[in-house]
């Protein structure tokens, strides 16, 4: 997949089509909450495997049962179709 920067109208659609994600400072971000650390870490492991598949890696933070994920494409300096695809895949993992 060749990444390209999303236009303003595509960014507005993104936050509607992919629930829970917000646009913050040239990136999209979502916070995920779990019952405990083990569930949070299990989620992160599943996300890591998808990230490797796309060769696209998030900035993320784990605080006990909370995981905060931020996505952007550094090489292009903003939010791309690749970030959108990865956010959608991450939501699918969370919804399982």
UniProtKB/Swiss-Prot annotation:
User: What InterPro entries is this protein classified in?
Assistant: PCD_sf (IPR036428), Pterin_deHydtase (IPR001533)
GO biological process terms, semicolon-separated: tetrahydrobiopterin biosynthetic process
The cross-references to Pfam families, in alphabetical order and at most eight, read: Pterin_4a (PF01329)
Q: What class of enzyme is it?
A: lyase
Its EC number(s): 4.2.1.96
Recorded catalytic activity of this chain's protein: (4aS,6R)-4a-hydroxy-L-erythro-5,6,7,8-tetrahydrobiopterin = (6R)-L-erythro-6,7-dihydrobiopterin + H2O
Q: Which HAMAP family match?
A: Pterin_4_alpha
Family, according to the entry, reads as follows: Belongs to the pterin-4-alpha-carbinolamine dehydratase family.
Q: Kindly provide the name given to this protein in its UniProt entry.
A: Putative pterin-4-alpha-carbinolamine dehydratase
């Amino acid at each position: 997949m060749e990444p390209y920067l999303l236009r303003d109208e595509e960014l507005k659609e993104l936050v509607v089509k992919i629930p829970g994600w917000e646009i913050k400072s040239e990136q999209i971000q979502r916070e995920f909450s779990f019952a405990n650390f083990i569930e949070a870490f299990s989620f992160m492991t599943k996300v890591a495997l998808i990230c490797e598949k796309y060769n696209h890696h998030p900035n993320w933070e784990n605080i006990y049962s909370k995981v905060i994920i931020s996505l952007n494409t550094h090489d292009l300096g903003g939010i791309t179709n690749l970030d959108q695809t990865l956010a959608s895949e991450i939501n699918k993992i969370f919804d399982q």
